[in-house]
Amino acid sequence: MRERNRSALHEKLCQILGSRNVYHDPPATIKMNYPCIVYKRDSVSPRKADNISFIKWYPYSVQVISKDPDFPLFDTFLDNFDYGSEGAPFVADNLHHSNFTIFT
C-alpha cells in the first residue's frame, strides 16, 4: 500500500512540475536538474480514538528547488493537495528552496 501511494505521489509531483526532475530521497552523488522537486517520507501520523488507530496520514517532506527566485510553483504548490503546510524558504548555493509538508 505504501509503495503504491509513493508511486502515485511521484507521478503527481512530475505532473505538477511538468518534468521528470522529481527525486525521492536522492543520494548526495546524484546530479539534479533544476527546477526540481525532492521529497522523502516522514514518520506516520496515526489518528486514534479509544487507543485504536482509525486513520493514518502519510506525511512527506517536499522541497521545490529552482534557480529562479520567482519560480511560480513556490506560490501554487499547495493548491495541488488537500492537506499540507509550508515551511520556511531558504537559499543555498544560489538555489531557492521552498519547503512543504504534504499528507497522503
Give the residues covered by each predicted segment:
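Small/polar-rich, solvent-exposed N-terminal microdomains that initiate assembly or binding
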Residues: 1-45, 52
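Loop/helix-junction capping segments adjacent to catalytic residues or to phosphate/diphosphate-binding pockets
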Residues: 3, 71-72
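Short, cysteine-centered beta-strand-loop-beta hairpins and adjacent loop/turn segments enriched
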Residues: 46-47, 68
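Oligomerization/assembly interface segments of phage tail-like spikes and tubes
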Residues: 54-68, 96-104
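Acidic-leaning, charged glycine-interspersed low-complexity segments
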Residues: 75-104
